[in-house]
Amino acid sequence: MAKRLGLDPYIVDTLMRDLIAHDRSQSAFVVFLWLWRQTHAQGRDKIGASLADIAHATGLSKSSVQNAIRRLSRRRLIGASKAGPTVAPIYQVNETWKR
């Protein structure tokens, strides 16, 4: 049996409409949900994942994931850090609406 995933109402009520309708970026919402699931819903603060990992997990192209990561970072919805040029980035989902 699959585990239930409880989403913060802000994610569905506000962020979804903002990213999809206003920014016209469905891929950013999909990537945000995947990163949120891999971190907060799993009780972790951060996750290391390559663009290829995220693309494979979400069904998006690598370029769509790259654009989504760029958009989410610019909006400060996620943070990304790299230890080196060949190391997968470490992502952190920022719940900025909870401040």
Predicted regions and their residues:
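Short recognition helix of helix-turn-helix/winged-helix DNA-binding domains
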Residues: M1-A57, T86
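Winged-helix/helix-turn-helix nucleic-acid-interaction surface
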Residues: S61-R99
